[in-house]
From Swiss-Prot, chain B:
This is Aspartyl/glutamyl-tRNA(Asn/Gln) amidotransferase subunit C. Belongs to the GatC family. GO terms for molecular function: asparaginyl-tRNA synthase (glutamine-hydrolyzing) activity; ATP binding; glutaminyl-tRNA synthase (glutamine-hydrolyzing) activity. Signal peptide: none annotated. Heterotrimer of A, B and C subunits. Its EC number is 6.3.5.-. Keywords: ATP-binding, Ligase, Nucleotide-binding, Protein biosynthesis. It comes from Myxococcus xanthus (strain DK1622). Allows the formation of correctly charged Asn-tRNA(Asn) or Gln-tRNA(Gln) through the transamidation of misacylated Asp-tRNA(Asn) or Glu-tRNA(Gln) in organisms which lack either or both of asparaginyl-tRNA or glutaminyl-tRNA synthetases. The reaction takes place in the presence of glutamine and ATP through an activated phospho-Asp-tRNA(Asn) or phospho-Glu-tRNA(Gln). It is an enzyme of class 6 (ligase). The gene is gatC. It comes from the Bacteria. SUPFAM superfamilies: Glu-tRNAGln amidotransferase C subunit.
Length: 486, 95, 479
């Protein structure tokens, strides 16, 4: 077994015992990246010097018996959407190529304070708009389980890097499923916390009312440990929540006996891959064996979620992306001679097709004469979708469903058909519209060896409950021990 | 609903995107398809429904009126495509 | 139809910069005059990833202003984004309030030749200022300075209740007085920290349908406001008279030419695409907070002016000057606690004190003497212990050194001689030396009397009590 095969907590235990140093772990991670990343292409940028310096500082703390946290010294990767002071951050876009932030995102600061070496920036769909990583302006990442397939998106690079054991864990962001869907497609754990649980300050915005950063790890316990580091109120984020942060590992092993798990009818629909359905149904039976009660529930407005999402998210994005104008940072079109050109040519050359498509859609949805019928109506339907969940959680403790309707698909398969790509998120995006926490945990493989993910959705701020439910399943099925055939 | 080419051009102007003729055509088709798909929302009766603009109903977090250090101008302008002394520079604005 | 057959209709939009230390959504200083982009940070530069957090004083100031202008305060007001591209607007949108502003439905009472008139306030909202672009920077470039970006503003929008340029000026002055009194704004039109746009239209007298309006900008003095409105009224009447139609547009006041001119913007029609700002939760203002703000509200200029005329019996002219600025009014009231001849006190304020303040450029807050000391000085003048003229010198010395009036009078030997015997001796001496002048006086040349007074005062180094000197001279000269 290689060092990089360890989970975060296993490594942390060895670091604490002095059996291995953070520098060794970080070097192992960097070596693994050298070996497999040419195939996986998860990284946009590796910060070897920064990571090793942080690792050595961690080793000094460990030696002096004053680690900064339990995860002190565990190397981590960051989706390239998190601003890192002095380290180029692009959100997968040409328009930010060469942009070196003057400040750290709040979560990056928290990770640094907790002593985690940050080995580099991970590939993503441009501005997190996509479900396959193919909208990255630089190159698509590949799924370690089948490199001809997508690792999912938008946090595809993060999921691929964790699955390929290039890093021990990573941070992603989830606007409509961007943490959970790639986790499901790569046999990893992805947790999207409750909106407001983790600070968005320094996280490049896609859709402000939906975006939420979260952990992407190999195991449920790692996700709990990483969430523990980043979940807290932030004075620099007016939407961050004051709700107390519990100990996420306290009830991890408490099991599901006596819990009521809702199975939403609308999440088992036509178009779902039969093998995905089979794996998920089997997981549901496992929960019954473990003592949980399955309850048939209905979320009647689910069928409107996709339309609602594809009005609200692009509308917010069209405004959030107005700052990329060639004036203060990032790209400015070389041939821009007038102010009008600085704007229109820079944005034309700097944004990719998917980003332009969504800016166009969002601009239209907000424009005079169309606002009421599109944006405002979508916000009202959003209320109905939230109320569906509120009613369901009066009956059950959590909801269980597939994370993605299909396993990893071939790169290039859906690029020319935006609508079929948008359908990849149908089970994940209602959770974002309602601001709820959601988690994807590995629940098996298809015959072709492609991972399948089980999604668990919970009440606001019940991340601990989701982790406990996921862990109960994981204890019986340690799929995370399987390594991808690289 | 089907978008016209004119509408696509108007929206591109609002969004400051200098689309190529091919993009204008492609977006006209693709956006029309998306707008057709979202048309289903029109069938819902939302007359009495309050809109949700924020995912969670947190109360507003405020800050005290105290100054904090600004960035030194060399850092503020470090990423600027064009500058003059400590100002950002753009092609002359014609009013 | 002549101009007099048309009724102008005017509404003003006031933009007042709030007197906070830091910007509305970040900790950068609001100080004026720094090197370009010295007061900027990732937030006000609109860098990727940044989020706004509201400066709570901005909300406090908005509530205070709303209450002073008799507005309804919304318990929950909503932030919106106004989307447009401009180099001095870093994020590509301005954070402002749109359909649910913090204050609505207020009024401000002004004086017109026909008496008092209440101008209705439509709404007050909070927003961030934009930066500054310098267009004539040379080299075919414009330069962008974002020091002003994110400075907090209140926008106060009146209903179109104003009927001529004088009313507009009166309204703007009254508004400035209120904001300055509240301590939320410095009232400086020249520097642009208090500025206004005017919406002007005309309609035939007797009509109830407003004409098409034009928005006037660049009105950075009361004089320009008046001139621009008067010009614009005449222009619109001309357009209508010559069979044309007024086009709704924004027009700039050209200070040099004395005309308003159309800002023929090549920009496409604006579509601001307002929508609720997802980065800022709605602002909640509790009933308790509103009550507390109402209780803490200072007396406003108009109420104070009325009280000064009734309580102190002052003429309206005096009261207006004394209440024009709150510190002066407060100081007057403090002095009135120590000196009861209010009109005489007012004279000293309007005369000597204001002259000294102006000449020395001293703010009232830096005065070195106490209201009790000023009362003491005026008492001494009344009692003849020091002459009115010498009293002015004493006040000057108090102003510069902060010494007590009695000490200054003693040190400088300014005490007035009111001892009849001492004065009589000097009078006798002067008369004895000027027998010829006495002859002239007695022969009817009465102006010689002034000569005697002057001689006596000079001999007494100006300290003789003038009333006594006069009285004794008249007696001795046999009048
Ligand atoms: Zn700032």
């Amino acid at each position: 077994m290689q060092l990089t095969d360890l989970t975060m907590l296993e490594l942390a235990a060895k670091l604490a015992a002095g059996e291995v140093s953070s520098e060794e772990a970080t070097r192992a991670s960097l070596t693994r990246i050298q070996q497999v990343d040419p195939k996986v292409r998860a990284f946009l940028r590796v910060d070897e010097a920064g990571a090793l310096a942080a690792a050595r500082a961690s080793d000094v703390r460990r030696k002096s018996g004053s680690p900064a946290s339990t995860l002190d010294g565990v190397p981590l990767g960051l989706k390239d959407i998190f601003l890192t002071e002095g380290v180029e951050t692009t959100a997968g876009s040409r328009i930010l190529e060469g942009f070196v932030p003057p400040y750290d995102a709040t979560v990056v600061r928290l990770l640094k304070e907790a002593g985690l070496p940050l080995v580099g920036k991970l590939n993503m769909d441009e501005f997190a708009m996509g479900s396959s990583n193919e909208s990255s302006a630089f190159f698509p990442s590949h799924n370690p389980w089948d490199v001809s397939r997508t690792p999912g998106g938008s946090s595809g690079g993060s999921a691929a890097a964790v699955a390929a054991r290039e890093v021990f864990g990573a941070l992603g962001t989830d606007t409509g499923g961007s943490i959970r869907q790639p986790a499901a497609l790569t046999n990893t754990v992805g947790l999207k916390p409750t909106y407001g649980r983790v600070s968005r300050f320094g996280v490049i915005a896609f859709a402000s009312s939906l975006d939420q950063p979260g952990p992407m790890t190999r195991t449920v316990a790692d996700a709990a440990a990483l969430l523990q580091v980043i979940a807290r109120p932030d004075a620099q984020d007016a939407t961050s929540a004051d709700a107390p942060v519990p100990d996420y590992s306290a009830d991890l092993e408490a099991g599901v006996r006596g819990l009521k798990l809702g199975v939403p009818r609308e999440y088992f629909t036509e178009g779902m891959d039969p093998e995905v359905e089979a794996a998920v149904r089997e997981a549901l039976r496992e929960y019954e064996r473990l003592g949980a009660t399955l309850v048939d529930v209905s979320l009647p407005h689910t069928k409107y979620a996709l339309a609602t999402y594809y009005l609200i998210a692009p509308a917010e994005a069209s405004s959030n992306l107005a700052r990329y104008d060639g004036v203060r940072f990032g790209l400015r079109a070389k041939d821009a001679r007038s102010l009008r050109d600085v704007y229109a040519l820079t944005r034309e050359q700097g944004f990719g097709a998917e980003v332009k498509r969504r800016i166009m859609l969002g601009t239209f949805a907000l424009s005079s004469g169309y606002y009421d019928a599109h944006y405002l109506r979508a916000q009202k339907v959003r209320t109905l979708i939230r109320e569906d969940f509120t009613r369901a959680f009066q009956q059950v403790d959590a909801l269980v469903s597939p994370t993605s309707p299909v396993p990893a698909f071939k790169l290039g398969e859906k690029v020319e058909d935006p609508l079929s790509m948008y359908l990849m998120d149908i089970y994940t995006l209602p959770c974002n519209l309602a601001g709820l926490p959601g988690l994807s945990v590995p629940c098996g493989f298809t015959k072709a060896g492609l991972p399948v993910g089980l999604q668990i959705l919970g009440r606001p701020f019940d991340e601990a409950g989701l982790l406990r439910i996921a862990r109960a399943y994981e204890r019986e099925h340690d799929f995370f021990r399987r390594s991808a055939p690289l | 609903m089907a978008l016209t080419l004119e509408q696509v051009r108007h929206v591109a102007t609002l969004a400051r995107l200098s689309l190529t003729p091919e993009e204008e055509q492609r977006f006209t088709t693709q956006l029309s398809a998306v707008l057709d798909a979202v048309e289903q929302l029109q069938s819902l009766d939302v007359e009495a429904v309050e809109p949700t603009s924020h995912a969670t109903l947190t109360s507003s977090r405020l800050r005290e009126d105290v100054t904090r250090p600004s960035l030194p101008p060399e850092k503020s302008l470090a990423n600027a495509p064009a500058k003059s002394d400590t100002s950002f520079a753009v092609p002359k604005i014609i009013e | 139809m002549p101009v007099s057959d048309f009724q102008p209709v005017i509404g003003l939009e006031v933009h007042a910069q709030l007197l906070t230390q830091s910007k509305i959504f970040c900790g950068c200083s609001t100080a004026f005059g720094a090197e370009p982009n010295r007061n900027t940070c990732p937030v006000c530069l609109g860098m990727p990833g940044v989020l706004p957090v509201l400066n709570q004083r901005v909300a406090e100031f908005a509530v205070r202003t709303g209450l002073a202008l008799e507005c309804t305060i919304r318990p929950t007001s909503v932030w919106s984004r106004k989307n447009y591209f401009y180099p001095d607007l870093p994020k590509g949108y301005q954070i402002t309030q749109f359909d649910q502003p913090i204050c609505e439905h207020g009024r401000l009472v002004i004086d017109t030749p026909q008496g008092e008139k209440a101008i209705r306030i439509l709404r007050i909202h909070m927003e961030e200022d934009a930066g500054k672009s310098v267009h004539d920077a040379g080299g075919g470039q414009s330069l962008v300075d974002l020091n002003r970006a994110g400075v907090p503003l209140l926008e106060i929008v009146s209903q179109p209740d104003l009927r001529d340029a004088d009313e507009a000026v009166e309204y703007l002055k009254a508004m400035r007085d209120v904001l300055v009194y509240l301590g939320v704004n410095d009232g400086n039109l020249e520097e642009g920290s208090f500025r206004c746009d005017a919406n002007v239209s005309v309609m035939p007298k007797g009509s109830t349908t407003f004409g098409q309006r034009c928005e006037l900008k660049n009105l950075n003095s009361f004089r320009f406001l008046k001139q621009a409105i008067e010009y614009e009224i005449a222009r619109q009447v001309d357009v209508i008279e010559s069979g044309g139609k007024v086009v709704q547009e924004t027009r700039l006041w050209d200070v040099n030419k004395g005309v308003t001119r159309s800002m023929r913007s090549k920009e496409e029609a604006h579509d601001y695409r307002y929508f609720p700002e997802p980065d800022l939760p709605p602002l909640h203002v509790s009933a308790e907070a509103i009550d507390a703000a109402a209780k803490a509200l200072p007396e406003l200029p108009r109420a104070k002016l009325q009280r000064f005329t009734s309580q102190y019996g002052l003429p309206a002219y005096d009261a207006r000057i004394l209440t024009a600025e709150r510190p002066l009014a407060d100081y007057f009231e403090a002095c009135a606690g120590h000196y009861k001849d209010y009109k005489k006190l007012s004279n000293w304020f309007l005369g000597e004190l204001m002259r000294l303040l102006k000449e020395e450029g001293t703010p009232l807050s830096a005065l070195r003497f106490t209201p009790a000391q000023l009362g003491e000085l005026l008492g001494a003048v009344d009692q003849g212990m020091v002459s009115a003229n010498a009293g002015k010198d004493v006040l000057g010395e108090m102003f510069r050194t902060g010494k007590a009036p009695a000490d200054i009078i003693a040190e400088k030997g300014l005490a007035q001689v009111s001892d009849t015997g001492a004065i009589e001796a000097v009078v006798d001496d002067i008369l004895a030396k000027n027998a010829g002048e006495i002859e002239k006086y007695r022969a009817g040349k009465k102006q010689v009397f002034g000569f005697f007074v002057g001689q006596v005062m000079r001999a007494m180094k100006g300290k003789g009590n003038p009333a006594l000197v006069n009285e004794l001279l008249k007696k001795k000269l046999g009048d």
